[in-house]
From Swiss-Prot:
GO terms classed as biological process: biosynthetic process; flavonoid biosynthetic process; methylation
Protein name: Cathecol O-methyltransferase 1
Stated role: O-methyltransferase that catalyzes the conversion of catechol to guaiacol. Involved in the production of guaiacol in fruits.
Catalytic activity as recorded in UniProt: catechol + S-adenosyl-L-methionine = guaiacol + S-adenosyl-L-homocysteine + H(+)
PROSITE patterns, alphabetized: SAM_OMT_II
Length: 373
C-alpha cells in the first residue's frame, strides 16, 4: 500500500511539474512570433532554401549571406533565435561535434518552415505575419480588457476609426496589409485549385470582393472557358489590370451582386477596403450579402465560400487553436467580425434561402463550402 501511495504521489508531482512548466512557457509565448518575424526579415528561410550545396547551415554560415551585417555578435544572436524556431519545428536542427567538447548547431528547412520561403511567384506566409506583428495591429491588444468592460472594438479604441477606414490614413500600413493579402491569396488559391474541383463545368463565375482580380486570374488560367466577373468597390476595380476572360464591375455587395452560375467568396481579399468576406462582418451583414447572392444565382447555382470553421467545443488540436486565435483577431480588429462554426454557417445559409451546405475540402485550415440554391 505504501509503495502504491508513493507512486501516486510521484505521479501527481510530475503532473504538477508539467503543468507549471507549461504555464511558464505561456508567459513567454509572445517571443515566438517576434522571433519568427525578425528571422523572415533577415531572409533566413530564403537563404536556407537557396543554398543547394548543403542540407543544413550554421548560424555563422547563414550570417555570411547577409551583406549588410556589421555586428560581430550576429551569429551568436541568430543561433539563439534559430534554436527557438527549431523547438517549434519551424526549422530542423542537427548538432555536430567539433572536438574538444565543442559542438555546433546546423539548421535546415522543416516542412513547416517551407511555407515561409518565397515560392516561384514570390509568395509566402511571411507578409501575413508582418501584418499581424505590425504596431497598428499589436496596439489593439492593449485595449482588449477595457473593450470587454466598456464595449467597443479594440482597434477603434486605439485608432479612432474602423480597420476598414484606417489604411487611407496610413499609406505604409496600407502597403503592409496589401502585401499580406496578395501573398496569402496566392498561397491559398494555389492549394484550392489543386484540391477543389467545383469550378469545373461553370460557364460564369462572380468573385465578390475580388479586389484586383487575382483570384479570377488564377481560376480562369486553369479553367479558360469560365467567364469571370470581378466585383468590388468602384474605386478598387478602377485600378484592376486587364485579364483574359475577366470583367471588372464596381458596386456595393450590400445592395446587389452580379449574376453568374456561381459566386465565389474567399477569406481575405486584396486590400482592407475589399475584405468583403463573411468573417469580417456581423450575422446581419452576412445575411444581407447572402440574400443578394441568392437573388443573383440561377436555380441550380451555388455560392463557393472559403472560410475557417470554429468547432463549438474548444480543443488543443492545432487546427482548432489556429481558428480560435483568428477569431480573437477578428474581435480585436473588426466591428462584428468573427469566425463561425459549421452550424452557424448552415443557419445563415438557410435563413438566406439556400437549401443546403456541403463542406467539400479543407485547404490551409480553411473549408471550401458550397451553399446550394
Amino acid at each position: 500500500m505504501g509503495s502504491t501511495a508513493n507512486i501516486q504521489l510521484a505521479t501527481q508531482s510530475e503532473d504538477e511539474e508539467r503543468n507549471c512548466t507549461y504555464a511558464m512557457q505561456l508567459l513567454s509565448s509572445s517571443v515566438l512570433p517576434f522571433v519568427l518575424h525578425s528571422t523572415i526579415q533577415l531572409d533566413v528561410f530564403d537563404i536556407l532554401a537557396k543554398d543547394k550545396a548543403a542540407t543544413k547551415l550554421s548560424a555563422l554560415e547563414i550570417v555570411s549571406h547577409m551583406p549588410n551585417c556589421k555586428n560581430p555578435d550576429a551569429a551568436t544572436m541568430l543561433d539563439r533565435m534559430l534554436y527557438v524556431l527549431a523547438s517549434y519545428s519551424l526549422l530542423d536542427c542537427s548538432v555536430v561535434e567539433e572536438g574538444n567538447g565543442v559542438t555546433e548547431r546546423r539548421y535546415g528547412l522543416s516542412r513547416v518552415g517551407k511555407f515561409f520561403v518565397r515560392d516561384e511567384d514570390g509568395a509566402s506566409m511571411g507578409p501575413l505575419l508582418a501584418l499581424l506583428q505590425d504596431k497598428v495591429f499589436i496596439n489593439s491588444w492593449f485595449e482588449l480588457k477595457d473593450a470587454v468592460l466598456e464595449g467597443g472594438v479594440p482597434f477603434d479604441r486605439v485608432h479612432g476609426v474602423h480597420a476598414f477606414e484606417y489604411p487611407k490614413l496610413d499609406p505604409k500600413f496600407n502597403d503592409v496589409f496589401n502585401q499580406a493579402m496578395i501573398n496569402h491569396t496566392t498561397v491559398v488559391m494555389k492549394r484550392i485549385l489543386e484540391n477543389y474541383k467545383g469550378f469545373e463545368n461553370l460557364k460564369t463565375l462572380v468573385d465578390v470582393g475580388g479586389g484586383l482580380g487575382v483570384n479570377l486570374k488564377m481560376i480562369t488560367s486553369k479553367y479558360p472557358t469560365i467567364k469571370g466577373t470581378n466585383f468590388d468597390l468602384p474605386h478598387v476595380v478602377q485600378h484592376a489590370p486587364s485579364y483574359p476572360g475577366v470583367d471588372h464591375v464596381g458596386g456595393d455587395m450590400f445592395e446587389s451582386v452580379p449574376q453568374g452560375d456561381a459566386i465565389f467568396m474567399k477569406v481575405m481579399s486584396k486590400s482592407l477596403a475589399e475584405a468583403w468576406i463573411l468573417h469580417d462582418w456581423s450575422d446581419g451583414h452576412c445575411l444581407k450579402l447572402l440574400k443578394n447572392c441568392h437573388k443573383a444565382l440561377p436555380d441550380n447555382g451555388k455560392v463557393i465560400v472559403v472560410e475557417a470553421n470554429l468547432p463549438v467545443k474548444p480543443d488543443t488540436d492545432t487546427t482548432v487553436v489556429g481558428v480560435s486565435q483568428c477569431d480573437l483577431i477578428m474581435m480585436a480588429q473588426n466591428p462584428g467580425g468573427k469566425e463561425r462554426s459549421e452550424q452557424e454557417f448552415r443557419a445563415l445559409a438557410s435563413e438566406a434561402g439556400f437549401k443546403g451546405v456541403n463542406l467539400i475540402c479543407c485547404v490551409c485550415n480553411f473549408w471550401v463550402m458550397e451553399f446550394y440554391k
